[in-house]
C-alpha cells in the first residue's frame, strides 16, 4: 500500500508538472508581441509638365529626395527640376507641391526651359513681385501685381526662376533673402534679372499673373504625405477647414510684410502658436524654430491675432 501511494504521488507529480509546464508555455505564447504590420507602400505617378511618359516614384521623405527620384525616372539631373505642381501640368501657383502631397495626387515636374536676361527700371519702391521657392534652392516668381513695375515688363512671367540679380547668382538663397535683395535695390536705377522659364509643351502657354491662391484641399483624399527636411515622411489627416483658413491668412501676412508666399512656412508658424497662451510665448517659439527670419514685431502680433481668431472658431 505504501508503494502504491508512492506510485500515485509520483504520477500526480508528473501530471502536475506537465500541467504547470503547459500553463507556462501558453502564457509565453500569449505574451509574445504580435508581428509588426507591414509598412504602407506609397507610390505616386509623375510626368514632366511639358510632356512625357508616366513614371512612378516612392520611398522619399523630403523635397530633395523626391526631385532625385523624379530625375532618376526621366534620366535628367535633379538640378533641372524647378518645381512641381499637383494634378495639373500648367504653371498654376495655387497647385504648387509643398511639404504635403495628397495620397492620390499626380505629380508634374516643371524643368528648366529658356534662359533670359531682362532689364528693369525701378521707378517705385515696390516692384509688385511675390517670391517663393521650391525648398531645394530655386526661388521663383509666384505672383505679379496688376499695374506694377514688373507687370509692365511682359517678358517676366509667373513661374520664372530667378537665377541672378545684377549678375549675382542667387541659387541656394531662400525666398525671403531674394525678396529682401529686390527690395533693397535703389530707386530710379536700372537692374538686371536673369530668369529661367519652365519648359513648355509648345512654348504656347499664355502669360499668367497668378491670382489669389488658396491653400485649399491639398489632396483628393482625406490623408496626405507630409515631407520633412529631417526625419521620415508621415501620413497625416488633411487639415480642418478652420486651420486651412488660418494658414491662408498667415500666408497673406507673409506676402504683405515680406513679399513672399509659403504655405509650408505659414503652417509651421501656425503650429508653433496654436498651444501658446500669449504673444510673448509665441514670439519665443518663433525664435526657436524660425530664428533666421527675424520677423518684425508687428508681423508677429498680426500672426498671433490670426491664431487667436482660429482658436475661437
UniProtKB/Swiss-Prot annotation:
InterPro entries, alphabetized:
GH2_GIPC (IPR055349), GIPC1-3_GH1 (IPR056814), GIPC1/2/3 (IPR017379), PDZ (IPR001478), PDZ_sf (IPR036034)
Residue span, PDZ domain: 117-197
Q: Where is this region: Disordered?
A: 14-34
Cellular component, GO annotation? basolateral plasma membrane; cell-cell junction; cytoplasm; plasma membrane
* MF annotations from Gene Ontology: identical protein binding; signaling receptor binding
Biased composition, Basic and acidic residues: where in the chain?
14-27
Designated name of the protein: PDZ domain-containing protein GIPC2
Amino acid at each position: 500500500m505504501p508503494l502504491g501511494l508512492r506510485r500515485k504521488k509520483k504520477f500526480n507529480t508528473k501530471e502536475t508538472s506537465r500541467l504547470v509546464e503547459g500553463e507556462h508555455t501558453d502564457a509565453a505564447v500569449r505574451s509574445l508581441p504580435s508581428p509588426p504590420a507591414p509598412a504602407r507602400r506609397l507610390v505616386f505617378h509623375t510626368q514632366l509638365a511639358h510632356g512625357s511618359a508616366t513614371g512612378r516614384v516612392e520611398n522619399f521623405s523630403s523635397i530633395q529626395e523626391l526631385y532625385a527620384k523624379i530625375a532618376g525616372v526621366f534620366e535628367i539631373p535633379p538640378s533641372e527640376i524647378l518645381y512641381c505642381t499637383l494634378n495639373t501640368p500648367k504653371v498654376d501657383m495655387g497647385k504648387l507641391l509643398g511639404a504635403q502631397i495628397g495620397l492620390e495626387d499626380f505629380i508634374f515636374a516643371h524643368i528648366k526651359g529658356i534662359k533670359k536676361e531682362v532689364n528693369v527700371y525701378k521707378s517705385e519702391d515696390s516692384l509688385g513681385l511675390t517670391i517663393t521657392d521650391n525648398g531645394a534652392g530655386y526661388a521663383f516668381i509666384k505672383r505679379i501685381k496688376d499695374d506694377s513695375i514688373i507687370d509692365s515688363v511682359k517678358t517676366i512671367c509667373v513661374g520664372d526662376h530667378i537665377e541672378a540679380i545684377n549678375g549675382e547668382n542667387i541659387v541656394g538663397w531662400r525666398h525671403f533673402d531674394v525678396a529682401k535683395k529686390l527690395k533693397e535695390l535703389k530707386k530710379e536705377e536700372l537692374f538686371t534679372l536673369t530668369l529661367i522659364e519652365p519648359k513648355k509643351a509648345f512654348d504656347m502657354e499664355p502669360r499668367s499673373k497668378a491670382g489669389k491662391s488658396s491653400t485649399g484641399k491639398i489632396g483628393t483624399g482625406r490623408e496626405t504625405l507630409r515631407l520633412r527636411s529631417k526625419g521620415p515622411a508621415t501620413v497625416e489627416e488633411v487639415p480642418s477647414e478652420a486651420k486651412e483658413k488660418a494658414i491662408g491668412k498667415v500666408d497673406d501676412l507673409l506676402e504683405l510684410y515680406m513679399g513672399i508666399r509659403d504655405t509650408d512656412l505659414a503652417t509651421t508658424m501656425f503650429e508653433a502658436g496654436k498651444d501658446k497662451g500669449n504673444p510673448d510665448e509665441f514670439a519665443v517659439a518663433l525664435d526657436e524654430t524660425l530664428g533666421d527670419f527675424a520677423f518684425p514685431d508687428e508681423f508677429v502680433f498680426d500672426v498671433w491675432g490670426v491664431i487667436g481668431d482660429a482658436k475661437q472658431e
